[in-house]
């Protein structure tokens, strides 16, 4: 069980048990219930989760498992879009902490159901085979209020907010199978894997407007309480259906060329079919297929260090519209990576460094809003190149002292040398540590961490004003303490964003910004039986 700031409460139970004396039939049941607020005004969330699985060894080397999960999420007081980033003069707005522009009735309710089954068989020669099926069913209902317009001043908006209700869902069937094992050839041991996947998604969505829109006043920003009249959703604005079908066949081969040198190679064939209808009329129908190869080499320099290089093709379907409202095609590209991995202290401490380069073409980048179609459009970049490197150190440096240190640098540019994907930081640094005190205090573990990122920015759109939305570099600090009363009972305190830093966690959506969560604390009691 857990309790924390902002009226946060959570309870979870996890039960596992055999159903017979031999343990050949066993099950697990997990249930969780969460109620929480937020440092953002008005926002609250309820979430209930139930998960169960039964496994049965139906033969000496054959296991069958079936299960499912249900998740119900009820957030309320949410905002459709963030807070306007700039005023009418193009100057950044310094919103008060916790400022929100949702209505008390605005929400995004979701219900998810998952059902799955798998059969796994181990052959006498050491090979394994699996067949699986998963069914996913999702629905959502979201009456929302949108205020990411341009404020005339901090006192009010230039127009009344936009109100819209979204409703929809999707059903997905996923089939999969794989076989893997080892074989001997040329005096060495090798590994092979072969598999397939097939999925079909049928989705639908509707949006509703209200005839009450024109009667609503311009909101008072400074004294916003969320007490906005509940609309009468009486105008069907959009009704669409989508059908996506993806089929893939893949294989990988790991060859032991020498005692120290290994070759990993493989390929995946993907076929993607997508169809959209709007108002009963087919809006688009596309079919793409592609083979994406992969090849990599690893070389054991000694017992501590292993060097590697790898190359893979990229094929990424993009479900977005271009400026002329045609469907964007897939993005294609290549990824190259090289690095060194190390294992110290008998495997308790691991480190790695790597450099990478990703070249892509036909990448969709957000361009603006199309009022005629009531949706966003994207322009297609002729080419982008992302270069960077990353380093990581993780593990136990001394008895009872664990550390994690990770640093990533990446920069993306188009063919003209202009930076793109600027809403993502070029630099990320993560550091965390936990230390279990020695001697009489060995039941207590203390730790903390810091998350730092470099500057991010987004361009404004829609011709409202020119300029950039900028988030300067910032760092977030966290603390934790854990006390073990026994091997089965422990209590833990986590404090996130210790300094209560005010920052944008994302930006650019309809010229808006989303603030990150402020300081929060959570106490968790865990009891095992």
Could you tell me what each predicted segment is?
Residues 1-52, 58-62, 113, 349:
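Outer-membrane beta-barrel translocator/receptor signature
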Residues 17, 118-134, 138-146, 307, ...:
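Membrane-embedded beta-barrel scaffold of Gram-negative outer-membrane proteins
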Residues 23-25, 61-64, 126-129, 187, ...:
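Repeated loop/turn-to-beta-strand initiation elements of outer-membrane beta-barrel proteins
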Residues 34-38, 53-122, 137-170, 214-238, ...:
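Acidic/polar loop-and-plug regions of large Gram-negative outer-membrane beta-barrel proteins
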Residues 55-59, 63, 170, 187-201, ...:
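Structural signature of Gram-negative outer-membrane beta-barrels, strongest in the C-terminal barrel
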Residues 115-138, 161-278:
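Face-selective signature of the C-terminal outer-membrane beta-barrel domain
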Residues 259-260, 357-359, 379-461, 499, ...:
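Gram-negative outer-membrane beta-barrel transporters
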Residues 359, 452-461, 482-529:
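C-terminal beta-signal and adjacent terminal beta-strands/loops
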């Amino acid at each position: 069980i857990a309790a924390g700031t902002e009226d946060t409460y959570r309870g979870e139970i996890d039960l596992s048990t055999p159903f017979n004396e031999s343990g050949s039939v066993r099950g697990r049941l997990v249930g969780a219930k969460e109620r929480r607020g937020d440092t953002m005004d008005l926002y609250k969330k309820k979430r209930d989760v139930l998960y169960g699985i039964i496994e049965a060894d139906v033969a000496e080397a054959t296991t069958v498992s079936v299960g499912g999960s249900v998740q119900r999420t009820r957030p309320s007081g949410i905002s459709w879009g963030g807070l306007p980033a700039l005023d009418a003069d193009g100057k950044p707005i310094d919103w008060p902490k916790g400022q929100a522009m949702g209505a008390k009735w605005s929400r995004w309710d979701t219900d998810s159901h998952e059902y799955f089954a798998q059969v796994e068989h181990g052959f006498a020669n050491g090979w394994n085979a699996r067949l699986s099926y998963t069914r996913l069913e999702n629905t959502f209902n979201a009456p929302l209020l949108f205020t990411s317009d341009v404020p005339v001043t901090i006192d009010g908006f230039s127009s009344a907010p936009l109100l819209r209700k979204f409703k929809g869902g999707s059903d997905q069937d996923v089939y999969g199978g794989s076989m893997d094992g080892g074989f001997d050839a040329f005096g060495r041991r090798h590994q092979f894997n072969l598999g397939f996947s097939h999925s079909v998604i049928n989705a639908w969505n509707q949006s509703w407007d209200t005839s009450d829109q024109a009667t609503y006043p311009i909101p008072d920003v400074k004294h916003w309480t969320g007490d906005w009249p509940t609309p009468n959703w009486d105008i069907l604005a959009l009704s669409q259906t989508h059908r996506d079908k993806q089929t893939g066949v893949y294989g990988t081969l790991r060859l032991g060329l020498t005692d120290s040198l290994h070759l990993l190679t493989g390929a995946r064939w993907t076929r993607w079919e997508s169809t959209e209808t709007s108002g009963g009329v087919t809006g688009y129908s596309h079919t793409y297929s592609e083979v994406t190869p992969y090849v990599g080499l690893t070389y054991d320099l000694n017992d501590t260090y292993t060097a590697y290089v790898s190359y893979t093709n990229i094929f990424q379907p993009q479900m977005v519209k271009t400026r002329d409202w045609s469907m964007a095609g897939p993005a294609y590209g290549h990824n190259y990576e090289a690095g060194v991995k190390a294992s110290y202290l008998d495997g308790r401490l691991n480190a790695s460094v790597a450099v990478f380069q990703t070249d892509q073409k036909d990448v969709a980048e957000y361009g603006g809003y199309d009022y005629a179609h009531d949706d966003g459009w994207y322009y297609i970049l002729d080419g982008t190149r992302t270069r960077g490197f990353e380093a990581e150190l993780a593990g136990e440096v001394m008895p009872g002292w664990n550390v994690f240190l990770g640093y990533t640098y990446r920069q993306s540019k188009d063919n003209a040398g202009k930076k793109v994907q600027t809403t993502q930081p070029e630099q990320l640094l993560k550091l965390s540590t936990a230390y279990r005190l020695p001697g009489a205090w060995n039941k207590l573990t203390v730790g903390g961490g810091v998350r730092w990122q470099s500057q991010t920015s987004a361009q404004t759109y829609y011709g409202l004003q020119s300029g950039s939305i900028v988030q300067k570099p910032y760092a977030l600090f966290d603390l934790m303490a854990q006390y073990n009363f026994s091997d089965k009972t422990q209590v833990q305190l986590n404090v996130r964003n210790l300094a209560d830093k005010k920052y944008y966690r994302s930006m650019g959506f309809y010229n808006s910004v989303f603030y990150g969560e402020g300081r929060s604390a959570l106490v968790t009691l865990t009891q095992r039986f």
